[in-house]
Amino acid sequence: MKQDIHPKYNEVTVVCANCGNSFVTRSTRPSIKVDICNNCHPFYTGKQSIVDTAGRVERFNKRFAKKAQA
């Protein structure tokens, strides 16, 4: 095997731009900045909003029923 062909693998700190959370991991990059992390992502925090599709389905069924009667 050839020696010294792989990039240097260092410990880096990942910083969230949104909430400021940081953690240490290993990477070939000198630093990592992420837009959103698990501390502030709506899916992980439970603040996820659910789209109301029931109203849309009812509206479609009303339109479809009108066209079926005609």
Curated annotation (Swiss-Prot):
Keywords: Ribonucleoprotein, Ribosomal protein, RNA-binding, rRNA-binding. PROSITE patterns: RIBOSOMAL_L31. GO terms for cellular component: ribonucleoprotein complex; ribosome. Binds the 23S rRNA. GO terms for molecular function: rRNA binding; structural constituent of ribosome. NCBIfam families: L31 (TIGR00105), PRK00019.1 (NF000612), PRK00528.1 (NF001809). Part of the 50S ribosomal subunit. The keyword RNA-binding applies. Belongs to the bacterial ribosomal protein bL31 family. Type A subfamily. Disulfide bonds: none annotated. It comes from Chlorobium chlorochromatii (strain CaD3). This is Large ribosomal subunit protein bL31. One of its GO terms (biological process) is translation. Pfam families: Ribosomal_L31.
